UniProtKB/Swiss-Prot annotation:
Role summary: Catalyzes the phosphorylation of the hydroxyl group of 4-methyl-5-beta-hydroxyethylthiazole (THZ).
Catalytic activity: 5-(2-hydroxyethyl)-4-methylthiazole + ATP = 4-methyl-5-(2-phosphooxyethyl)-thiazole + ADP + H(+)
Gene Ontology process terms (BP): thiamine biosynthetic process; thiamine diphosphate biosynthetic process
Broadest EC class assigned to this enzyme: transferase
Any Pfam family the entry gives: HK
Species the sequence originates in: Burkholderia thailandensis (strain ATCC 700388 / DSM 13276 / CCUG 48851 / CIP 106301 / E264)
SUPFAM superfamilies the record matches: Ribokinase-like
Protein name: Hydroxyethylthiazole kinase
């Protein structure tokens, strides 16, 4: 297993590519996370659009540089909307991220919709340990949208899920792990207050999509997104409280210089 961080050359190259290209990234996410997700994308130089207005799911799912679907978008959009966007991406080769929020938390109808989306072959699946263990067929009930399991305990499950789905799978925790079912990358660091900022994990899915839009290796893109998140959180760590930390975190994302 290899460890990477902000000082890894490939991580900085991934961010530099996004800043040069300013990719159009389309997302279906929940209204709780939409604002932070958009601001994270803007901070790294991407161009976001979020929501299911009219024919956006079909048109933008097919035409964006990349797509991310946070399944808590079901709060305000129907399952058919998520399927439409995922199908459009799958049929046109648009790379996309699946974030199966709260999977395994005790809502079987919701979980069934999440499982259906796997048929549209996401490029990356990201979530917390409880969500990914459940998606892989294990048992690790989350506490609502929060995890009750460690990222270490999810390692075997995410490897199996990656091999079965063909997706890169990324689990967040004190140490993040990203795997394609063969190779696994570990990313340490960050700040525990990210877990106290609404939508921070959801916005990570958006950042992964921005890096995926550059058409490089999905494993490298997903791992780089975690490393970028970690360094921004570390640099925001001297913020006084959770609210100022959230603002400072976006500031630090916007100030990251791949050439530093």
């Amino acid at each position: 297993m290899e460890s990477i961080n902000w000082n890894t050359r490939s991580v900085r190259e991934e961010l530099a590519a996004v800043k040069r290209a300013a990719p159009f990234v389309y997302g279906l996410t929940n209204y709780v996370a939409a604002n932070l997700s958009a601001n994270v994308l803007l901070a790294v130089g991407a161009a976001p659009a979020i929501g299911a207005a009219a024919d956006w799911p079909a048109r933008f799912g097919a035409g964006a540089g990349a797509l991310w679907i946070n399944t808590a978008a079901l709060m305000s959009s129907g399952a058919d909307t998520l399927r439409t966007a995922a199908r459009a991406a799958s049929e046109t080769g648009t790379r996309w991220v699946l974030d199966p929020v709260a999977t395994g938390a005790g809502a079987p109808e919701y979980d069934a919709i999440v499982q259906e989306l796997l048929a549209f072959r996401p490029s990356v699946i990201r979530g917390n340990a409880s969500e990914l263990i459940a998606l892989a067929g294990g048992t690790a009930a989350g506490k609502g949208v929060d995890t009750t399991a460690s990222s270490d305990s999810a390692l075997a499950y995410i490897g199996d899920l990656a091999r079965r789905s063909g997706a890169v799978v990324a689990v967040s925790g004190p140490i993040d792990y990203v795997t394609d079912g063969i190779d696994t990358l570990a990313i340490a660091g960050g700040d525990a207050r990210l877990t106290r900022v609404t939508g921070a994990g959801c916005a990570l899915g958006a950042l992964i999509a921005a890096l995926l839009a550059q058409r490089g290796a999905a494993l490298a893109a997903a791992a780089a997104a975690h490393a970028i998140y970690a360094i921004a959180a570390e640099r925001a760590a001297d913020a006084r409280g959770t609210g100022s930390f959230a603002v400072r975190f976006v500031d630090e994302l916007s100030l990251l210089d791949p050439g530093e």
